[in-house]
C-alpha cells in the first residue's frame, strides 16, 4: 500500500486513512485490561520468550536512555529497567491512554518506577529532540500504526547516531505446514478466546487480521531502509510467526 493514499487497511477492511487511528484506539481501549492475559493465552506463554530475545538484541548497558514505543502495559519496560539501572531511563510511549494507565498501575504494583516515565505520544510524530535515545524498542505495535514509514522516520530522527531500533512483531511463517496450523489457530480459536476472556470477539479478530496485513520480513526490512536505517537484519522466531528486526543509525 502506498502510505500517502487516502485509504488504508484496518484488519481486512479498507477505511479512510484519517479514521484508522481512532479505530485502533477503540480496539486497545477495549482490550487494555485483559491485554497481557490474552497474550499469555494466545501465544501459550511463548510471547515471554520472544520478548526476552528481543531485549537481548538491544545490548543494553547501565545509564542508557531507552524508548519503549507502543509500550502500553510495560511488559518490555520491566525487563529493560534493571538493565539500564537508576542511572538510565526508560520512556514508555503509547498513543493509547488506557494502555498506559494499565502499565503505570502494574509497574507501580511491582515496585518498578525509579527510572520509568510514561508519555502519551503518536509514533508518527514523536515529541522528543533529535538524537535523544540510545535504543528504541517497539513490541507488537508497528502493525497498528497507520503510516509505518512515517513512524520509522520519526524513530530514526530521535535515536542517537550509533544507536539502533529493535522491532518485535508478528510476521509470516516460513514453513508451509506451520502456516496452515497457524491460520486455523488464529482465525478459529483466538477470536473465540477474545469473546470468552475479554468479552470482545471483534477486537481480537482485528488483531489477527492486522497480523496478516503486516509486511512480511523482507518488506519490513525494505521499509526500514527507506527510513534511512542501515545494516538492517532480522531473526525469525518460532518458524517466522514472529520476527525481530534491527536497524542502525550512523
Curated annotation (Swiss-Prot):
Protein name (database record): Ubiquinone/menaquinone biosynthesis C-methyltransferase UbiE
Keyword Transferase found: yes
Function comment: Methyltransferase required for the conversion of demethylmenaquinol (DMKH2) to menaquinol (MKH2) and the conversion of 2-polyprenyl-6-methoxy-1,4-benzoquinol (DDMQH2) to 2-polyprenyl-3-methyl-6-methoxy-1,4-benzoquinol (DMQH2).
Keywords: Menaquinone biosynthesis, Methyltransferase, S-adenosyl-L-methionine, Transferase, Ubiquinone biosynthesis
UniProt keyword Transport present: no
UniProt similarity note: Belongs to the class I-like SAM-binding methyltransferase superfamily. MenG/UbiE family.
A molecular function GO annotation: demethylmenaquinone methyltransferase activity
InterPro entries given in the database record: SAM-dependent_MTases_sf, UbiE/COQ5_MeTrFase, UbiE/COQ5_MeTrFase_CS
Catalytically driven reaction(s): a 2-demethylmenaquinol + S-adenosyl-L-methionine = a menaquinol + S-adenosyl-L-homocysteine + H(+); a 2-methoxy-6-(all-trans-polyprenyl)benzene-1,4-diol + S-adenosyl-L-methionine = a 5-methoxy-2-methyl-3-(all-trans-polyprenyl)benzene-1,4-diol + S-adenosyl-L-homocysteine + H(+)
Annotated EC: 2.1.1.163, 2.1.1.201
Pfam families associated with the record: Ubie_methyltran (PF01209)
Entry superkingdom: Bacteria
Higher taxonomy: Bacteria, Pseudomonadati, Pseudomonadota, Gammaproteobacteria, Legionellales
Chain sites annotated for binding S-adenosyl-L-methionine: 73, 94, 122-123
CDD domains in UniProt: AdoMet_MTases
Transmembrane segments: none
Pathway membership: Quinol/quinone metabolism; menaquinone biosynthesis; menaquinol from 1,4-dihydroxy-2-naphthoate: step 2/2; Cofactor biosynthesis; ubiquinone biosynthesis
Any one GO biological process: aerobic respiration
